[in-house]
Amino acid sequence: MINVIDSMCGSGKSTKMFKMMQESYGKNPNKRFLYVTPFLSEIDERVPKELPSMNFKTPENKGSGKLSSLCDLVTKGDNIATTHVLFSVLTSEIVDQIIKMQYVLVIDEAIGCVGLLNNELKKSDTTALLKSNMVFVDEE
């Protein structure tokens, strides 16, 4: 299921997402999260401050690079915070591993990420997703 939260800038969307993650994790600490944001400050400052019990890890630019580090974190089942840039270059193998490990994907400021699918999704695909309730728009 995809839950889209759309609202004015500064209306508390990120805060709402953080609260939803914290509540979900509180109910099931085995749940895994992949949080994607365009802002390094969110990863470096806000995530550790607001979600300390979830122990989010960040891909590091060591050894084989950030993409390899992300793959390692997914394989270990860590909660992960990363950027849109790194998310945009995921390989199909990493995506398969994310699915296999049953990650909850949370994309903040998702316009750029969703744009990656524009060449693959047709209007009829979007309509079918909405009608099947696999995607919905949160009116809050």
Please describe what each predicted stretch is.
Residues M1:
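Pre-Walker A adenine-sensing motif
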Residues I5:
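Hydrophobic anchor at the beta1->P-loop junction of P-loop NTPases
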Residues M8, K13, K76, D138-E140:
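Helicase motor interdomain insertion/brace
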Residues C9, T15-E60, V85-F87:
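Conserved Walker A/P-loop ATP-binding site and its immediately adjacent core
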Residues G26-N28, C71-V74, D96-I99:
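Conserved catalytic network of the ASCE P-loop NTPase/AAA+ motor domain
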Residues R32, K76-I80, M101-V104:
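Loop/turn-to-beta-strand initiation segments
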Residues L51-L90:
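Inter-Walker segment of RecA-like/P-loop motor cores
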Residues F87-E140:
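Signature of the SF2 helicase/ATPase Hel1-core->accessory helical subdomain module
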